[in-house]
């Protein structure tokens, strides 16, 4: 068991930035899943526990938890959600690094997540269709962060040609 943990630590240290982001996302997913299991085993309600890490659509709730603009992009709703986000990050992260640096990928990942989160909040607070759902809507997952790396890559290819 100790060698597995040592190997994981070493892979994290030596891995590319996209591997490190995948490790962080998977670690958060495992921790939240284990927390959910523990709550269920002890017949405790999980309602509201992770809302403090998910991005609320409500501006008033966001003011009370501004850190959620960063934490939401590391939370995932289920196995398939994290699987496809991490596959997307793995494939396009490697491709991204063939044109840009690790620092660029980290920045694009974080800024893409922040911009995606702000766009989500703006949409829920501007468009009348979403207004009735604003108070109980939350965003989670790397779905805003990961595709930005691909679109940034496509923009670079377009300018290069």
Residue ranges and their predicted role:
Residues 1-17, 24-26, 161:
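C-terminal transmembrane module of polytopic alpha-helical membrane proteins
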Residues 14-140:
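N-terminal TM1-TM2 helical hairpin plus the immediately adjacent luminal interfacial "cap"
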Residues 136-150:
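Membrane-interface loop-to-helix entry segments
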Residues 1-2, 7-9, 47-52, 85, ...:
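A short linear-motif detector with a strong N-terminal bias
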Residues 151-158:
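Conserved small/polar residues in nucleotide/adenosyl-binding loops
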């Amino acid at each position: 068991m100790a060698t597995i943990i040592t190997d994981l630590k070493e892979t994290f240290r030596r891995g590319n930035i996209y591997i490190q982001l995948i490790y962080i996302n998977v670690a958060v997913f495992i921790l939240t899943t284990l927390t959910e299991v523990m709550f269920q085993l002890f017949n405790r309600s999980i309602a509201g526990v992770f809302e403090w890490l998910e991005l609320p659509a409500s501006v008033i709730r966001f003011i009370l938890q501004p850190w959620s603009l960063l934490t939401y992009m590391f939370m995932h709703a289920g196995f398939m959600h994290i699987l496809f986000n991490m596959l997307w990050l793995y494939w396009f992260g490697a491709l991204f690094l063939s044109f840009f640096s690790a620092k660029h990928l980290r920045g694009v990942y974080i800024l893409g997540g922040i911009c995606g989160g702000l766009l989500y909040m703006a949409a829920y607070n501007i468009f009348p269709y979403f207004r009735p759902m604003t108070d109980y809507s939350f965003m989670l997952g790397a779905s805003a962060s990961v595709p930005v790396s691909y679109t940034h890559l496509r923009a670079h290819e377009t300018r290069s040609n």
